[in-house]
């Protein structure tokens, strides 16, 4: 049984991450209104504030700032989005909708 509060959209989606400990290219393994899982060889520290951006239709789109809640070397890390404002939440819903639509037409 899936205990997640928000349904996930499974990737992969090409992206980049940036945080205090570094950054790099990555793949978003899945994304939801609650956060995302980032597949990356390099990982930030648990508790670190991290930004993730992806390209969609030639446009770079920035996900809300999140906090790394788990990290595993060689696999990646989970970012949680918390306390999003109405505008951030609306933008994230729009982005997930666009990714879902792109998946259907691919």
Question: Each predicted region: which residue ranges?
Answer:
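Short, solvent-exposed secondary-structure boundary/capping segments
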Residues: 37-40, 74-83
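Extended Gly/Ser/Thr-rich low-complexity repeat segments
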Residues: 48, 54-55, 89-101
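N-terminal helix initiation/capping motif
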Residues: 1-31, 41, 93-106
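Short acidic/polar mixed-charge low-complexity motifs
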Residues: 22-24, 59-60, 75
């Amino acid at each position: 049984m899936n205990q997640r509060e928000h349904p996930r959209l499974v990737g992969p989606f090409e992206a980049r991450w940036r945080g205090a400990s570094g950054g790099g290219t990555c793949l978003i393994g899945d994304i939801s209104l609650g956060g995302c899982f980032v597949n990356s060889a390099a990982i930030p520290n648990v508790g670190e504030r991290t930004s993730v951006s992806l390209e969609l239709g030639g446009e770079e789109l920035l996900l809300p700032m999140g906090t790394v809640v788990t990290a595993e070397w060689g696999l990646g890390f989970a970012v949680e989005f918390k306390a999003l404002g109405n505008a951030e939440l609306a933008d994230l819903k729009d982005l997930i909708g666009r990714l879902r639509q792109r998946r259907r037409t691919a």
